[in-house]
Amino acid sequence: MKDSRIYEIGPMFCGENGHITMRSLTSLMVDISTIQAERVEKNLKVMDHKVWLLYSWDIEISKPIKEGCEIKITTIPTHMKRFFAYRNFIVEGNGEILAKAKGTFILFDQDKQRAAIIDKKVLVAYGESPEFYTGRNYKKIGNFEKSELVSIRRSDFDKNHHVNNGIYFDYIKEIPGLDEEKISYIKMIYKNQIKNEEKVGLFYKKGQDKIDFKIGSEIEHAYGMVEYV
């Protein structure tokens, strides 16, 4: 199963130099996956009061995506296991692959306020497809060299009353010297939602063409790494 949609990359999707932001790119990926999910789950009663929450992103950028581009984003649900559902995404433009990604989602029961085991009816409805992009394993580092303090804005919150997952990509842009246009790979793993915090810490360690990062307060909110071209 796969679904695709064409998107025009207008200035609202781009940063100061006309390149698409990671927040915008992931938002468009979520958009096409939501369109697919609404169609597939329309008559599945077992999905009542359940939602998909993002658990992690693996994204590889092979070509720049700029303002004025017309891109096609395709999403393919590959497989599911217990609480988790895995999706591949492919971003194409001018006959070329511009980016590919793996998104991991966790099924959440809104009534019980906990993760829910995926019902067999959902497995059958989505089916399985081979993974064309498996992402990478990542081991969180223990020691970070530097940190910044990030203020949480009311506009960062979405209808679920927590900071939108895409905003985390904006937060890591506060790392000095991080140039979003030159990112070739990014891993983002979400842990605990940002709900009541007024500020969070942004911890990071720079290496050669690589930055490890963590977003946290009294609890851990997210971590991952960025690689440059």
Give short role names for the model-derived ranges:
Residues S4, S56-K139, Y190, I194-K199, ...:
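HotDog/MaoC-like acyl-thioester-processing domains
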Residues M1-L54, T104, D109-E180:
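Hot-dog-fold acyl-thioester-processing enzymes
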Residues K182-Y185:
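Phosphate-/nucleic-acid-contacting segments
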